[in-house]
Structures are given as structure tokens and as C-alpha cells.
Amino acid sequence: MPLLPPSRQKDISNPLLKKIIVDVNNSRHNFIAFLWHALFLAFVTTFIDVNTVFSSLVLKIGGSSFHVGMLTGIAVGLPLVTQLLFAGFLAGRTRKKPFLLMGIYLRVLSLAGMGYTLAIAEKSDPSILMFTVFLWVGLFATSGAFAGISYTDILGKALPKSERRRFLISKQAIASVAMLSSALVVRHLVIALPYPKNYMVIFIIAAALLFIATGGFWAIREAPGKVSPLSRMLKVLKAIPHVLKNDKNLSNYILLINASSLGLTVIPFYIALSKARFGLSGHQIGNYLLLQFVGMALSTIIWKKIANRYKFKGISFCYALMGGLLPLLALVLSRTSIDFFQWIFFFSGFVISAGKISIEGILLEITTNDNRAIYAGISGTLSLTTAIFPLIAGMLIERYTFSTVFIFASPVIFSSIFFLKRIQCKP
């Protein structure tokens, strides 16, 4: 909706006022376009959830905790550690939208490929099937890194600072409702259809939904940005020590995400713990998925109230606190019954939503339009624990116990609160 009706707009002669009207109209247009993408991406997120859908698929194929760790390392860690490569390339481009769309279409291809692979799964050797699944996950994760940097940069340029917090909260609210409804669909598919047909249908639908989601980005009006002097990877690598030394916000942010991310990367191992203690049926997978997304939906209401008073740092504090408590609670509840243990996934929904809102929000507040792509690449590449922890955790669980990993993870996650307090977000 225009700020003023056409009859009034033609009477405006002040160039500054004209610019304000155009900027406000573009902001509203982009706000809606981003929400369109967020809505359909939320549907997709449920269908390809790493914590439940992917992890259970690996276990169904015949994998172990080690394979779950490898999967998590690829799906969560690979996009982060490859960001620097893409950040240098993208920093040399004034417009990021074409590269954002390319990254998303590669993700559509990988999901469709996953569906085809599972369509012929019964004729495939389990080892080859596992390897092929990991290849598709690798393509999905890498193209996600390419798209993710572009997304963050465009979001920073397309929405004024005054609109970003409202957008991120609105995005999570819409996403939570969408994910909750799609969780019911995925739960039904997992239970009603036999393996591997259920997973095949899930990934084909996910590919179609992600394709529809790109419509929002086609509609975005992207303003051209400046070309960063750090537009080549070698220059970026050489500049990292200087950037970290001169920007304490960035260095503390990197330490924050390294410590707090363990709260997210440990979640897939709750599925492995469930299989070890209670078995793993389609009914269980469906219930875990549903409880996780119910938690995400309900938590959005709480995060909105916290954001209004304490901003993104308040949400990040809750993210670290709950993320640190959950592994210990999982160990306790795993010694009871599945009726109690399944609520771990409900509370993991709180952790996931808090992480998505706060980590992205804090990055927006400590960066500018000129350095955002580079900072996203640096922080992602230096998120070493996100990539390495799942691999080490999987091996330790195979060799020792779940207690070894979970008890180690909790204090590390709690330590992120120290780095959070040292970050100065711009008002």
C-alpha cells in the first residue's frame, strides 16, 4: 500500500520527501516478500528437519551415532565453514539477489535428487545409499551457505533497522504456525507410509515447496550495495586478524556462536539416545517432530515479549541457558520412560527458535551494509565447533557413552553467556 494516494503523491515537490515515500513503500513491499519466503521455507524446514527427519533416516538406513554426527557436521557445520569462500566472492558484487536465487535452486535440485535416491533405495546397497544421501546433504548444505550470505546482506539493505526486529519476530511467528501445521503432515507420512516411500514423498514435497518459496525473492527490490575492498578470499584471510583485533563485537560474537551452537548440534543425538533406550518407530519419529515444532510455535510468543524489553541479547541469554540445561535433562529423562523423554523435543523447539532469532538478529545489529557479507563469512568460517563437535561427539558416543558428550557440552554452552555480555549492540 503506498504511503500516500496517487492524487497526493503528484503534488509532492520536495525531493527528500519523495525519497522517504519511495523508501517506505519499498520497505513494505520487501517486508511482505520476505514473509512469503519465510512462510514456505517454514513448511520446507519441517520436511527436512536435521534433528528428526534426517537423523532418523540415517538410522533407518543402518547408521549409528557416528553417522548421525557426520550428518550433523555436514548439514550444520559445512554451510558455516564454507561461508568465507563465498563471502569474498559475493563482497565483490553490488547485487546479491541472482546468487541468492542460484543457491536456492541448487537446494531444490538436491532435495529432488534425495527423493529420487530414496525411490530406488530398495534396489541400492545400504553403503552406497548412505554415501549418496550424504552427497545430496553436502550439496544442500553448501548451496545453503551461498544463499545464506546473500540473504543476510539483502535483508540488511532491504529493511531499515527499525523494521528488522519486527520482521524477525513476525517471521518466526509465521514460521512457527507453518511448521506446526506441516509437522502434522510429516508425522502422518512417516507413520502411514512404509520406509523408504515415506521419506521419498517427504523430500519430493520439500523440493516443490522450496521452489514456490523463491517467489518471494523474485519480488524483492534490492538496492545496489558497495563493493567491499575485501572482495577476494586471500584478502579476507589476511584481514581476519586485523578485523578481529579492531572489532571486539565480532570476536565476542564468534566466541558466542561457537559456544552456544553446541546446544543446537547436540539435538540430533537425542534421536540416537532414543533409539538406544526405547527403539525408534515411525510413530516415535512423528511425535518427536510434532513436539519440537509445537515448542517452536509456543516459544515465539515468549521471545516476542523478551525482545521488546531486552532485545536480541535477551533471547540469546535464554538460548544459552536452555541449551545448556537440555543435555543434562535428556540424560535424566532417558532413565525414566518414553512418555517423559519425548518432552525433550518440545523444549528443544524453544532452543532452536531462540537460536534462529537471536544469532541472526545480533549479527544484523553489530554490522553495517558495507561489512555484513564479510562479517557473516568470517563468523561462519570461524564457527569451528559447529562443524567439528558433531563428528567428535558421534565418535565419543560410539566409544564411551552419551553421558560423556552431554555432560561436556553443558558447561561449554553456559560459557557463551560470558561472551554475550561483552557484545555491544547498536541501538
At which residue positions do the language-model features occur?
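Helix-loop boundary and gating motifs at the non-cytosolic
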Residues: P2-V81, L90, A112, N249-L289
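Helix-loop junctions on the cytosolic side of multi-pass membrane transporters
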Residues: T214-S231, K421-P427
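Membrane-helix interface/capping residues of multi-pass secondary transporters
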Residues: S65, R95-K96, M130, K161, ...
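Substrate-agnostic recognition of the 12-TM MFS/MFS-like secondary transporter fold
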Residues: A33-T52, L71-A91, P98, G103-V108, ...
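MFS-fold secondary transporters
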Residues: G113-T117, A121, F140, F217, ...
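C-terminal transmembrane helical hairpin of 12-TM major facilitator-type secondary transporters
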Residues: G314-K356
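Structural signature of the two symmetry-related core transmembrane helices
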Residues: P98-Y116, G314-L329, S410
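Helix-loop junctions at membrane interfaces in 12-TM secondary transporters
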Residues: Y116-F134, V332-I344
